[in-house]
Amino acid sequence: MDFSYEVENYMYNIKNKPDIFGEQRILDENDNICGYEEKLLINATMLDLESAVKLARKYNAFVCPAHIDKQSNGIIGILGTFPEQPEFDYAEISDIAKTEQLKQNYMNLANCSFICNSDAHYLWDIHEADNYILLHDEPYSSDIIRKELFKKLMQKE
């Protein structure tokens, strides 16, 4: 929670308008609504990219820029290039077929591994399991899944 509190210092204090942006529900571990976030969360923070990564790594976070190959909200679409700094071990893309082209176009991605994700916000938008990571999950718990995922991601191929 320390990370969340620290990031909050860099957020713009703009109140959410649920009628426009939707409710920002706070759920418990059983998906029961236990509150609503009043501050609008879709805004950017006051952190630049390098500062955000530095802050995340201070808390031992795994940093992976999302949907870098998408024009809207992807880092390449926003910046016009993939930045040389900070360095990332992984980047998430929506189409695994773009891997070699991205590495050719952006030399600083040459040593980067890619995670392919549908970026689905609804169950019916999830693609077939063409790209997947097998994880040990017994006895089932979200903590085990999270630990297994990070362990697998840290084993660069």
Language-model regions, residue ranges each:
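Extended substrate/RNA-proximal surfaces in nucleic-acid metabolism proteins
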Residues: 1-89, 97, 107, 145
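Active-site metal-binding loops of divalent metal-dependent hydrolases
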Residues: 68, 95, 118-120
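Histidine/acidic-residue-rich catalytic or RNA/ligand-binding cores of hydrolases
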Residues: 73-80, 124-137
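Glycine-enriched alpha-helix->loop->beta-strand junction motifs that scaffold or abut catalytic
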Residues: 83-90, 109-114, 131-134
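Acidic/histidine-rich catalytic cores of soluble enzymes
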Residues: 96-102, 126
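Short, aromatic/basic amphipathic alpha-helical patches
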Residues: 102-109
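Short acidic/histidine-rich active-site segments
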Residues: 112-128
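Mid-to-C-terminal alpha-helical segments outside catalytic/metal-binding sites
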Residues: 137-157
